[in-house]
Design a protein with these regions (language model features):
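Short, small-residue alpha-helix embedded
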Residues: 70-84
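Noncatalytic modules at the cell exterior or secretory-pathway interfaces
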Residues: 183, 260-286
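Catalytic-core environment of secreted peptidases
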Residues: 1-72
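Short loop/turn segments at secondary-structure transitions that flank enzyme active sites
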Residues: 31-35, 103, 191-193
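Low-complexity, serine/threonine/proline-enriched polar segments
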Residues: 217-262
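An often Trp-containing, charged/polar helix-loop segment at the C-terminal end
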Residues: 85-109
Length: 304
C-alpha cells in the first residue's frame, strides 16, 4: 500500500497548491488505498478498498473507493446526525461534522498547520462525538441570523454583531485551577456567490458577506473586548492573543465553516465565557441593500 494507515489517501484531492485559497477539504473520510504493482505501477485492490452493494444483480458486492466512497460516508454521517437530533438545521449538521473532526497521528506528522489544513482539512469526524456531543462534553449550539450591513449617508457600513454570554459553570472552572481544558468553537454559514464573478483577484467579491467569531481573552475587560471588534467605537483597541488559537484567525477564515480551539487552564477559561459573531466584507456591501437579502443564517457550536 502507498499510504500508511491513518494517512491521507493517494486518491484524495486537496487545496495544498492553492496556498492562499479556501480550506478544502474541510473533512476527510475513508476512501481506500492504492497498491503498487511491478507491471501496472499503481492500482486499486479489493483488500485496500471499501465494499458496497453492486448495481449488477448478478454480483452481490463490489469494491468502492476514492471520492465515491468518502462522499457516501460523509452523507451517511450527516443523515445520522439529523436523525439523532431532528431539530438541528443543516447548517448545524454541517458544523457538527467539522466540530467533531480530529487529525490522526499520521496527519499530525505532516508538520505545520498551514500544510495540514489544505491537505486534510480539520481531519476525520468522530461519529460518537458528533452524535452524542452533549453526553461527552458541555456543548452549546446557537442557531441565529444576522443582518450584516445597513445604509448610512449613502453608503453601506457594518450593522449587527451578536454577543453570546455562555452559560457555563464559572465557579467549577475556577475550582479546577491549573487543570488543562479545551474549548472548541465552530461557525457554519452559507454565502450567495456573486453572479459571474470568480473572485480570484479579490476574495471578498465572491461571497455575499462573510462572518467571523472571536472569544474574549482572560486579560481584557468586557468593554475592551467589544471595542476591539466594534469599529464604530473609536480608536480604543486591545490586542487579541492570536497565539492561543490552534488554527489561527487568518487560516480558519478561509471558508464558510470555521473551526478553532484553545487549550488553557480551567481558571483562565473561567473568565473567557463571551463570544461575538460579526460580519466582514462581501459583495452585498457594495450593492443597494434594497436589492439583496442582507440576512445570513448561521450556526455557532461551542464545546468544552
Amino acid at each position: 500500500a502507498l499510504a500508511a494507515p491513518g494517512n491521507l489517501s493517494p486518491m484524495s484531492r486537496s487545496s495544498w497548491s492553492w496556498r492562499n485559497g479556501c480550506n478544502k477539504p474541510e473533512i476527510v473520510m475513508e476512501g481506500g488505498n492504492i497498491a503498487y504493482h511491478p507491471v501496472f505501477q499503481t492500482t486499486t485492490h479489493p483488500d485496500l478498498s471499501l465494499i458496497t452493494t453492486c448495481q449488477d444483480l448478478a454480483e452481490s458486492l463490489e469494491q468502492f473507493h476514492a471520492t465515491s466512497a468518502a462522499t457516501a460516508l460523509a452523507t451517511r454521517l450527516a443523515a445520522k446526525i439529523k436523525t439523532a437530533t431532528p431539530t438541528l438545521s443543516m447548517l448545524s449538521v454541517r458544523g457538527m461534522m467539522v466540530h467533531s473532526a480530529k487529525w490522526t497521528p499520521e496527519m499530525i506528522r505532516i508538520g505545520n498547520i498551514k500544510d495540514i489544513i489544505p491537505l486534510c482539512g480539520y481531519g476525520v469526524p468522530d461519529e460518537e462525538t458528533a452524535l452524542f456531543s452533549n453526553e461527552k462534553y458541555a456543548t452549546f449550539i446557537f442557531e441565529n441570523e444576522l443582518i450584516p450591513y445597513w445604509e448610512k449617508d449613502g453608503s453601506n457600513t457594518y450593522n449587527q454583531l451578536h454577543f453570546y454570554d455562555l452559560p457555563w459553570p464559572t465557579e467549577v472552572l475556577e475550582q479546577m485551577g491549573e487543570e488543562n481544558v479545551k474549548i472548541r468553537i465552530t461557525l457554519s454559514y452559507y454565502v450567495k456567490p456573486s453572479p459571474g464573478y470568480a473572485g480570484r483577484s479579490n476574495k471578498y467579491r465572491y461571497p455575499s458577506a462573510t462572518l467571523h467569531f472571536d472569544l474574549k481573552s482572560a486579560s481584557e475587560s468586557m468593554e475592551e473586548f467589544l471595542c476591539r471588534r466594534n469599529k464604530s467605537e473609536g480608536e480604543k483597541r486591545t490586542d487579541n492573543d492570536t497565539n492561543r488559537w490552534t488554527i489561527k484567525q487568518q487560516r480558519r477564515e478561509q471558508g464558510t465553516v470555521q473551526s478553532d480551539w484553545i487549550e488553557c487552564t480551567a481558571a483562565e477559561l473561567a473568565s473567557c465565557g463571551q463570544i461575538i459573531v460579526y460580519p466582514g466584507q462581501g459583495w452585498w456591501k457594495e450593492r443597494k441593500l434594497a436589492n439583496v437579502d442582507n440576512v445570513i443564517k448561521y450556526s455557532l457550536i461551542v464545546s468544552i
